[in-house]
Regions:
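Nucleotide/phosphate-binding catalytic cleft detector across ATP-hydrolyzing
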Residues: 1-85, 97-217
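Short beta-strand scaffold segments in enzyme catalytic cores
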Residues: 90-94
Length: 217
């Protein structure tokens, strides 16, 4: 998977099948249903590919929703913008009166932060990812990736043009840095909020949107 899009169908099916089996064994229950989330704006073919992967792994697919909208379901937002900073993209959903009125995304995400860290310290990507996600290193790392965060804020500013919103909510693991919201607030001149565990919001939103068939209740 690259930037939320399937690039190797066979390996993706194998991976999801293995994870499904491991989780079923750990929980002691069968998991017949699945939902998924996609970056906003991906092609219809990419959406279908994600569904095919889940079906290939033995799931019945109940729903596929865009990532920021999944997050909004958890945050219970009716008016505002949800910005989901994923591994490869920064996506947005704008909501008004509880309805999504705009979605979009652009290819700048956590992987770009990691590449910046790798280049700065001249270390392998995998080592840079560990360094980036080590809480004790946050004060050292954030100045290195601040320009990337500012780019994410600029992307969000572009998405918001023409819309009046009361606040922005940021989710995704890359939003975990303590100074992340202050960079966004400075650029957007809007209140910016981050939940306690931003990494977990979108996955929980996918589960909320699973829409189990009536027979499963």
């Amino acid at each position: 998977i690259q930037d939320g899009v399937i690039v190797n169908y066979y390996e993706s099916v194998q991976l999801v099948t293995r994870l499904k089996a491991e989780l079923e064994e750990r929980l002691g229950v069968e998991l017949p249903y699945a939902a998924a989330a996609i970056p906003p704006g991906v092609s219809e073919g990419s959406v279908k590919s994600i569904g095919y992967v889940l079906e290939g792994a033995g799931f019945e697919v109940t729903n596929i929703v865009d990532e920021p909208t999944a997050a909004a379901a958890v945050l219970k937002i009716t008016d505002g913008a949800v910005v989901d900073v994923g591994g490869g993209t920064t996506g947005i959903s704008i909501l008004k009166d509880g309805k999504v009125i705009y979605t979009d995304d652009e290819a700048t995400g956590g992987s770009h932060m990691t590449m910046t860290v790798a280049g700065h310290y001249r270390i392998p990507y995998e080592e840079a990812e560990v360094l980036k996600t080590t809480p004790e290193k946050e004060k050292e790392i954030f100045p290195v990736i601040k320009a990337t965060v500012e780019k994410m804020a600029s992307i969000t500013e572009k998405f918001l043009k023409g819309y009046e919103i009361p606040a922005v909510y940021v989710v995704g693991g890359s939003a975990s840095f303590q100074e992340f919201t202050s960079v966004f607030e400075k650029k957007l001149n809007l209140p910016v909020y981050r939940p306690v565990h931003p990494l977990l919001v979108t996955p929980l939103g996918i589960a909320y949107n699973c829409q189990l068939p009536q027979k499963a209740h």
